[in-house]
A protein has these predicted regions:
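Conserved phosphate-binding loops in N-terminal lobes of ATP-dependent enzymes
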Residues: 1-75, 82-91, 136-160
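Short, charged, surface-exposed secondary-structure boundary motifs
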Residues: 110-111, 202-204
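Small-residue (GG/TT-enriched) beta-loop-alpha framework at ligand/catalytic clefts
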Residues: 84-176, 184-193
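A generic structural signal for short coil/turn motifs at secondary-structure boundaries
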Residues: 76-79, 174
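Short beta-strand/turn micro-motifs composed of small residues
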Residues: 74-77, 168-169
Length: 212
């Protein structure tokens, strides 16, 4: 039994535990159904209707085992309040001692020892979220080069006159994220650091108090 909190990634493309040196992944069918139907009340699992909150409970329970304290649940920063509430409510059926953070919070731990300002770039299926002194979203409606150029302009505006570290989140579970994040236009995002989970997410968690 680990004395630390389990750190659980809830989305964008998987539900899994990131701490303790190895991935523990929720059942693929259950997690896929839970993520796909997070905006609904009922989902189909093996062609049968299942309550979405039940799917989230099962998925979170399977990856939170063997940890004494309540979990730290990390969700995509661009999720709506309603989506976050679905995950939070499911986690609280496991234990009332639950801590919920956006993904940008976890990624910022990677630069916790740096004095410069931090900007987090999260690449999602349909948008790129830029979180710094403010939060902005760039739609992924055009090619990767154009999107990278637009994101670079947003970063330049946010960091005008200051030194900043740019953390680029490139989830392996998001289609096209690696190509978008690896675009030549990203070279203009100065002081950039790519976070390709889960290994580098674990590095970030080492500075997270109370996690494995």
């Amino acid at each position: 039994m680990s004395p630390h909190r389990a750190v659980i990634e809830a989305g964008p493309g998987a539900i899994r535990r990131l701490c303790c040196g190895a991935d523990v992944v929720a059942d693929t069918a259950v997690s896929a159904a839970a993520l796909a139907a997070i905006d609904d009340q009922v989902a189909l699992l093996d062609e049968r209707p299942v309550a979405v909150d039940s799917l989230w409970f099962d998925a979170l329970r399977s990856v939170a085992v063997d940890h004494r304290d309540g979990p730290v649940v990390v969700h995509p920063s661009w999720w709506s309040a309603a989506r976050v509430e679905v995950v939070t409510a499911a986690a609280r059926t496991l234990t009332r001692d639950v801590v919920v953070h956006p993904r940008s919070w976890l990624l910022r731990q990677a630069s916790s020892g740096v004095s410069a300002a931090t900007v987090v770039v999260e690449i999602a299926e349909r948008l790129v979220l830029v979180a710094g002194a403010e939060v902005a979203a760039v739609a992924r409606r055009t090619d990767a080069e154009s999107v990278a150029g637009q994101v670079g302009s947003v970063i330049a505006r946010m960091t005008r006159g200051i030194t900043a570290v740019v953390l680029i989140d490139v989830p392996s579970t998001v289609a096209g994220a690696a190509f978008c994040g690896g675009s030549p236009r990203t070279r203009s995002w100065r002081c950039s650091q790519f976070i390709t989970e889960p290994a580098q997410c674990r590095s970030a968690m080492r500075s997270t108090r109370g996690a494995c």
